[in-house]
Amino acid sequence: MISDSLNKILNRNNIPLDEVEKVVYEYILQSIFEDIVAYLLEDNNKENIMNNLRQFEDKEIVVNKLILDITGMKVNESELSTITKWVIAFIEKKSSRIKIKDKEKIKLLENQNYKCKLCKREIDLCNSEYDHIISWKLVGDELENNYQMLCKHCNRCKSSSILYRFIMLFKKY
């Protein structure tokens, strides 16, 4: 259920509610993850959690406790699975980037119909940049399907901000 005023502004501007809901949902999950990362970067927390993850076969138990303790949020199985993958990627992150080949960039461009994932402008190999959906500084190159092609403008504005996608949602309609 959304407020009448929000519904009216979305309708006036032809902004689909399902798009807003999707972006807000992804923002919430990424915010939970960023809170966990901030916690892991304090003191010896990362080392302690790494030890807990090694001890338990079901890593989701450890991550679920982290989520509850740090954010107070309750997540479903799918959300827990996603956040657990992100936490493990953060812990296993390597300090150097993997260089992506043009062939892989072209495949991403084809999957995106040669449009920037955020602003939907037409792009090609020359005027686009390879981007990590979940910031490289958080998960490195450890996650599959964490890549997208953006126009240079969106990639530079986005940086590691998870809010940029939300902002662009309103600018494209």
Model-identified regions with their sequence ranges:
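Short intrinsically disordered terminal tails
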Residues: 1, 172-173
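Mixed-charge, low-complexity interaction segments
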Residues: 1-85, 99
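Short, well-structured alpha-helical interface segments that form or flank functional binding sites
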Residues: 31, 103, 142
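Short, charged surface segments at domain edges that flank catalytic/cofactor-binding sites
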Residues: 74-118
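Alpha-helical architecture
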Residues: 111, 129-130, 153
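Cys/His-rich metal-chelating microdomains
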Residues: 115, 122, 136, 153-157
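Histidine-centered nuclease catalytic patch
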Residues: 120-149, 162-164
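Short Cys/His-centered divalent metal-binding micro-motifs
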Residues: 147-171
